[in-house]
């Protein structure tokens, strides 16, 4: 078991989101109260660049002696899954996935084009080649017990049943109602933190 002071939590935001999301800010505040290290990078819309950003941060924190804990929201959950299965230090990791995007190469096919970011005036260009990159990032699960999947039945963008089916053997927290952004997130943080901070 790791002491919480030896952990670093990485929050990986979703499509068009940012470190300014309400969940990212709340998690940062809660972890600061516990003295737990926290990273919340502003991920590029390019999947390959986003992976490089995340990998750089994880490797830096590993070199400092931290064990990574991942929280991935929506598309960030897909990225977290890739690291949980592909990173050389995956045996040190655990991940909580919040309404994770299971098959983004399919689900984001209609999003090719330009978009305004959620929390700024930045214009994001999502290219069709990114769908191929996402398809290539699909991985199987080697240790599903290291995942907690939080799936809201009221998710208006993604099907919660896909989330449960994608992660057999994981711990599942299925929430009646709620929504894609988990507007009731504070209610579920105790269970998430109990899973991650050990």
Name each model feature, range by range.
Residues 11-15, 71, 98, 150:
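Short hydrophobic segments within beta-strands
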Residues 31, 87-88:
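Active-site catalytic pocket residues across diverse enzymes, especially alpha/beta-hydrolases
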Residues 8, 67-69, 94:
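Structural motif
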Residues 90-198:
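The alpha/beta-hydrolase serine catalytic core
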Residues 82-86:
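Active-site signature of alpha/beta-hydrolase-fold catalytic machinery across serine-
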Residues 71-81:
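Gly/Ala-rich beta-loop-alpha elbow adjacent to hydrolase catalytic centers
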Residues 4-65, 180:
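Active-site catalytic motif of lipid deacylating hydrolases and related acyltransferases
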Residues 1-4, 141:
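Short, flexible hinge/linker loops that cap or flank conserved catalytic cores
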């Amino acid at each position: 078991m790791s002491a919480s002071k030896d952990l670093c939590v990485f929050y990986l935001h979703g499509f068009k989101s940012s470190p300014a999301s309400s969940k990212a800010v709340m998690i940062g505040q809660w972890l600061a109260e516990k003295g737990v290290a926290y990273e919340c990078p502003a991920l590029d819309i390019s999947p390959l660049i986003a992976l490089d950003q995340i990998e750089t941060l994880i490797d830096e924190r590993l070199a400092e002696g931290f064990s990574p804990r991942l929280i991935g929201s929506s598309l960030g959950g897909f990225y977290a899954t890739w690291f949980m299965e592909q990173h050389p230090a995956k045996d040190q990791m655990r991940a909580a996935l919040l309404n994770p995007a299971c098959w983004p190469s399919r689900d984001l096919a209609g999003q090719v084009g330009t978009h305004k970011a959620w929390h700024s005036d930045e214009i994001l260009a999502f290219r069709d080649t990114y769908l191929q990159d996402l398809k290539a990032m699909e991985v199987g699960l080697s240790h599903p017990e290291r995942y907690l999947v939080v799936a809201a039945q009221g998710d208006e963008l993604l099907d919660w049943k896909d989330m449960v089916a994608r992660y057999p053997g994981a711990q599942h927290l299925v929430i009646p109602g709620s929504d894609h952004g988990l507007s009731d997130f504070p209610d579920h943080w105790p269970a998430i933190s109990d899973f991650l901070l050990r």
